[in-house]
Amino acid sequence: YRFPPLKRLSFDYVVDAHLCQTTDELQAFYDTYTEQFFQAMETGKQWGITVSSIKYHNLEQIKMRACAGGFDLTPQGTLSMCFFVSSPKEAFYHDFIYGKVEGGKVVMDEAKFKRLVTCSNNSQLKCGRCFLKWHCAGGCLYHTKSYSKEMLEVMCRFQRKFSLIALANLLTGQNILKHEST
């Protein structure tokens, strides 16, 4: 082979406030993503490929905030807290950029970095009662900035549904979505 065979694939969902006009459209989008993700996971097993995603990986972690934060270098030489944000053309670019590489050195706004890295949404009232509080940790800052309150509620439902399916699949050793429809 010119390239070694694939061993791992990550399929993550799209985050775009303009992708769907209504909460029903967004829910349908995430429902389709969930079905396709678990189908891909099953297909991957047949080929010896581990299929994962950010949401799936988060189930293996206990954390205080949704994301540890990034040291993501953009094409402009700036440092972004979030891999979703990499271009000055993006609405939240200046919210997530905290430094740059200049003259062969990393220059950081340490106060902004600290603000970004300590930001957490897991103190929301609804999170206190959620079984995913320490895995979802209140959701992603990028989601919070991107979506309306109603759209964020769809994200919460998606997170819970996706996680329950993942856990049921692990317990049963099969894709419950596939067996649910037969």
Regions flagged by a language model, labelled:
Residues Y1-R8, A40:
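Conserved AdoMet/S-adenosylmethionine-binding subsite of the radical SAM
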Residues D12-D16, Y56:
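Active-site beta-loop-alpha junctions enriched in small/polar residues
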Residues Y30-N58, V85-F131:
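C-terminal accessory region of radical SAM enzymes
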Residues M64-C67:
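Short, small/polar residue-rich loop motifs at catalytic or cofactor-binding pockets
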Residues T74-P75:
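Short, ordered coil/turn segments that flank beta-strands lining enzyme active or ligand-binding pockets
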Residues T78-L79:
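Hydrophobic "anchor" residues
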Residues S87-E90, F96, K100, N122-T182:
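Radical SAM enzyme core and accessory elements
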